[in-house]
Amino acid sequence: CPIGAHSDHQLGKVTGFAVDQGIRMAYRAKKSGIVEIRSLNFATRAQWHINAVPDKCQNDWADYLRGATWALAKRYPLTKGVCGIIEGSLPIGGLSSSASVIITFLSALCKVNNIHMSEHEMIMTALDAENNYVGVSCGKLDQSCEVYSKKNHLLYLDTKDDSFELIPQHPDMKPYKIAIFFSGVERNLAGSKFNMRVDEAKSAAYALMAYAGMDYGKFEEARLRDVPREIFEQYKDRLPENWRKRATHFYTEFERVEKGAEAWRRGDIEAYGRLSFESGHSSIYNWET
């Protein structure tokens, strides 16, 4: 996500690219309904039945796969499990690795159970697994990038109405390379302060709605996308510092995404790059990732 980070859970607009790394899985169907899975990236194996997924996370790497099973079983009858080996070339906790492993495993379960899901349904099932089983309050950016992205195109997605566009690289765009650096720091969003920051953004939306006399409903439904920026500018000084920072990131990032999509469309890679660096700066200092 070059521009649009940390705004999908607030129903913002985002951009995304495909990368040439990912998750690979070799598998076969198991008529018994048992899932037996081994990862070449971790020492332990995991096993469960497709219709008896543990109610709670086991706090290991396979929780994402259990979540995928749980989310799919809510939508379709499952009769077959899988026996497989999974391997990834993505850094753990980075580059959408959790979304990638969920979608890879969902695809395998769908294949052996003869289930045909639309792209949007695949995204929402993967999001359900991560939100409601693993317990990460993420939005749909990562899942959408995994499903929709196309080589030499920029994904431009509105996470509020799910409309998206794949903007092709302009024929006159200057040559460029995108470098991704692995810091060596691995993380697990479920065990980080990620959820707290999402709640701070929701709290800012909830408070701004109240200050402005808007109908603010339930906390879970409060999103900054539903609060006009003019309201934020009017009442931002009343917000606690952390809430104000999260909201500042959202509103400035929303503007950067729109400008970035237009810069990409006209082939201005330098402008797009500047906006991407500004996005990273805001992620560090306003979102405090």
Q: Which positions does each model-derived feature cover?
A:
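ATP-binding N-lobe of GHMP and related small-molecule kinases
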Residues: 1-96, 103-120, 124-134, 138, ...
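C-terminal nucleotide
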Residues: 24-60, 71, 153-289
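Short N-terminal signal/transit or membrane-insertion segments
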Residues: 99, 103-118, 245-261
